[in-house]
Swiss-Prot record:
<dbReference type="GO" id="GO:0016879">
    <property type="term" value="F:ligase activity, forming carbon-nitrogen bonds"/>
</dbReference>
<comment type="similarity">
    <text>Belongs to the QueC family.</text>
</comment>
<dbReference type="InterPro" id="IPR018317">
    <property type="entry name" value="QueC"/>
</dbReference>
<dbReference type="GO" id="GO:0005524">
    <property type="term" value="F:ATP binding"/>
</dbReference>
<dbReference type="GO" id="GO:0008616">
    <property type="term" value="P:queuosine biosynthetic process"/>
</dbReference>
<feature type="binding site">
    <location>
        <begin position="7"/>
        <end position="17"/>
    </location>
    <ligand>
        <name>ATP</name>
    </ligand>
</feature>
<keyword id="KW-0479">Metal-binding</keyword>
<dbReference type="Pfam" id="PF06508">
    <property type="entry name" value="QueC"/>
</dbReference>
<feature type="binding site">
    <location>
        <position position="196"/>
    </location>
    <ligand>
        <name>Zn(2+)</name>
    </ligand>
</feature>
<keyword id="KW-0067">ATP-binding</keyword>
<dbReference type="GO" id="GO:0008270">
    <property type="term" value="F:zinc ion binding"/>
</dbReference>
<comment type="pathway">
    <text>Purine metabolism; 7-cyano-7-deazaguanine biosynthesis.</text>
</comment>
<keyword id="KW-0436">Ligase</keyword>
<dbReference type="InterPro" id="IPR014729">
    <property type="entry name" value="Rossmann-like_a/b/a_fold"/>
</dbReference>
<feature type="binding site">
    <location>
        <position position="199"/>
    </location>
    <ligand>
        <name>Zn(2+)</name>
    </ligand>
</feature>
<feature type="binding site">
    <location>
        <position position="193"/>
    </location>
    <ligand>
        <name>Zn(2+)</name>
    </ligand>
</feature>
<keyword id="KW-0671">Queuosine biosynthesis</keyword>
Length: 232
């Protein structure tokens, strides 16, 4: 199956790219510049495409991102510290982000005669991000069947939608994903901060998967205290 992967450069999507390269015919990686403060993630997506020997396209939607105000990822709002499963993390929502990206990706896939678009949403995203939930994935696939009816039949692959991030780490290890060549931190500094929701979730996932985490964090111990507090 000719598959186009939406790849941010993060652990989830890079692991997905390696999985799709092994299980399908990977036709390319598609990334989006929406004005995210952690834009350096795109360099990791580019490196992934080069490693897998496929084209990499970055689509500039910064003008759209500039209109999606109020998010800590695109606006002048601090990225909070803590675990994803906290109300404070809702400030990292970029409204309709996945819907916008997927609509573009399906158009690109149809134009390129690809059979599928793959997206790395997972179970850990459900609490905060509505456009990562199974209901959204199913509804979007249905909508695209109507949108491309008579022109193309493009499937939406979301193999991790019911999985945990620890499951993704285990799967990534299976497909030899170089985890050190992925970027998660929302703060976009030189090193992973170790304190934002995505850093905490990343560090916890390696721990739960029983796999060594090669990531260099500014605060390598914060995740333990915040996860213990959450589970208390």
């Amino acid at each position: 199956m000719k598959t186009l992967v939406i790849c941010s450069g993060g652990l989830d999507s890079v692991s997905l790219a390696h999985k799709m390269a092994a299980e399908h015919e990977l036709t390319g990686l598609l990334s989006f510049d929406y004005g995210q403060r952690h834009k350096k993630e795109l360099d990791f997506a580019q490196a992934c495409a080069k490693r897998l020997g496929v084209p990499h396209q970055i689509i500039d939607i910064r003008t759209i991102g500039a209109s999606l105000t109020g998010s800590a990822l695109t606006d002048d709002v601090d990225v909070p510290d803590g675990h994803y499963a906290e109300e404070t993390m809702k400030v990292t929502v970029v409204p309709n982000r996945n819907a916008i990206m997927l609509a573009i990706a399906f158009g690109v896939a149809a134009a390129q005669k690809a059979d599928a678009v793959a997206l790395a949403v997972h179970g850990g995203d459900h609490f905060i991000y509505p456009d990562c939930r199974p209901g959204f994935i199913e509804a979007f696939q249905t909508m695209q069947k109507h949108a491309l009816d008579g022109y193309a039949d493009v499937k939406l692959l979301a193999p991790y939608v019911h999985a945990t991030k620890a499951d993704i780490v285990a799967d990534g290890a299976k497909y030899r994903t170089p985890f050190e060549a992925t970027w998660s931190c929302y703060k976009g500094a030189d090193r992973h901060c170790g304190r934002c929701g995505t850093c905490v979730e990343r560090r916890e996932a390696f721990h739960l998967a029983g796999i060594d985490d090669p990531t260099s964090y500014e605060d390598a111990d914060f995740w333990r205290a915040t996860t213990q507090k959450r589970n208390a």
